[in-house]
Swiss-Prot record:
Protein name per the record: Adenosylcobinamide-GDP ribazoletransferase
UniProt entry tagged with the keyword Membrane: yes
Residues annotated as transmembrane: 2-22, 61-81
An individual GO BP term: cobalamin biosynthetic process
Length: 199
């Protein structure tokens, strides 16, 4: 057990509490809005209209439940890792999630003025090498285990796929895309790190 015999469930709960206390829960709103938009039939403009609706739909509920379940099960897996490996996986996952958000800013455009345009308007694809240069060293955070490298790769890969899907769905990157990319990257990063450790 991690943390000197503390039960895995307690460690997982503490992880979730700290993550949401530090980063906030606004990213989950992006997940919810993306879930609602995903079930709308129509073009990107029709889907963006749903984002302004204050009613929570089944798509939002399903998306948030899946993400939170992914975080819970991923953090339970991390809690079973040796302490140094667990720390490496958590750090690499967070760096990967933020790297994915930076990639959204560098590679996507915003469909309208708002939070998304504040980021995409000030970033270019030319900034990606610097982003990668800052992120890559964290892959060594769990040496000799490659778990942190797996977490980083999983988070960044999931972020890229989510960015591509959501920007196509919504016709660009608004604030909800940034939030959803962050959360999906976090979930996949945790699981990827745990899976790599078991190999």
């Amino acid at each position: 057990m991690l943390a000197g015999g503390v039960p895995h469930g307690t460690v997982a709960f503490a992880y979730l509490a700290v993550v949401f206390a530090v980063t906030g829960i606004n990213h989950l709103d992006g997940v919810a809005d993306a879930g609602d938009a995903a079930v709308v039939h129509g073009d990107p403009a029709d889907r963006r209209t749903v984002l302004k609706d204050t009613t929570t739909g089944v798509g939002a509920i399903a998306a948030v439940v899946v993400v939170v379940a992914g975080l819970v099960t991923g953090s339970l897996g991390v809690a079973a890792l040796p302490t140094w490996t667990a720390v490496g996986v958590v750090v690499a996952t967070e760096v990967g999630a933020k790297t994915s958000m930076a990639a959204v800013a560098c590679l996507a455009h915003a469909p309208h003025d708002g939070l998304g345009s504040q980021f995409t308007g000030n970033a270019t694809p030319g900034a990606l090498p610097a982003v990668a240069g800052v992120a890559l060293p964290v892959a060594l955070a769990s040496v000799p285990s490659p778990a942190a490298a797996g977490a980083l790769a999983g988070a960044v890969g999931a972020g890229a796929l989510t960015r591509r899907w959501l920007t196509g769905l919504l016709g660009g990157a608004n604030g909800d895309v940034f939030g959803a990319v962050n959360e999906v990257s976090r979930v996949v990063g945790l699981h990827a790190g745990v899976v790599v450790w078991t190999l």
